[in-house]
Amino acid sequence: MSSPSKRREMDLMKLMMSDYKVDMINDGMHEFFVHFHGPKDSIYQGGVWKVRVELTEAYPYKSPSIGFTNKIYHPNVDEMSGSVCLDVINQTWSPMFDLVNIFEVFLPQLLLYPNPSDPLNGEAASLMMRDKNAYENKVKEYCERYAKPEDISPEEEEEESDEELSDAEGYDSGDEAIMGHADP
């Protein structure tokens, strides 16, 4: 396992063979989406988020960049950008960690044990410290509004349908141009 590119391929394959749905962006192995489910027995249970992952050329020596694409209410996640404030990923990353660790350990731990003293979402941190019940209700409301399976899948299906339609239309008009119109 000498080169970062081999390690990147191995880690990505391991992630794809796990229980996570992975959607590649473009043709490279540097950017992809992972469908992440909220941890069981938590206020995030039932939520499904599409997490964008970007691997640098230096991966696994440098941490991947991760961010939620659909909204999540959490003190350590920026509500607008989806950026994650996660010490393990941002500061203490080590090549011994892999992509599966992010989705099986780091993100579930972040959701289960938020750190309101180091917030990216000050409103969520403040509400969590002031009124835990109101905070939990708001998390559940966000899960209902923004983190259902249909919130992360339909646009992909629509894009595929549109592409299939344009491919079919292009094929038909191309045939007519080459062969001409049939004689009546």
UniProtKB/Swiss-Prot annotation:
The keyword Phosphoprotein does not apply. It comes from the Eukaryota. It catalyses: S-ubiquitinyl-[E1 ubiquitin-activating enzyme]-L-cysteine + [E2 ubiquitin-conjugating enzyme]-L-cysteine = [E1 ubiquitin-activating enzyme]-L-cysteine + S-ubiquitinyl-[E2 ubiquitin-conjugating enzyme]-L-cysteine. Residues 1-148 form the UBC core domain. The active site is at 85 (glycyl thioester intermediate). Its EC number is 2.3.2.23. Keywords: ATP-binding, Nucleotide-binding, Transferase, Ubl conjugation pathway. Pathway: Protein modification; protein ubiquitination. One of its GO terms (biological process) is ubiquitin-dependent protein catabolic process. It is an enzyme of class 2 (transferase). GO terms for molecular function: ATP binding; ubiquitin conjugating enzyme activity. Coiled coil: none annotated. One of its GO terms (cellular component) is nucleus. Changing residue 85 to S: Loss of activity. Residues 152-175 have a biased composition (Acidic residues). Catalyzes the covalent attachment of ubiquitin to other proteins. Belongs to the ubiquitin-conjugating enzyme family. This is Ubiquitin-conjugating enzyme E2-23 kDa.
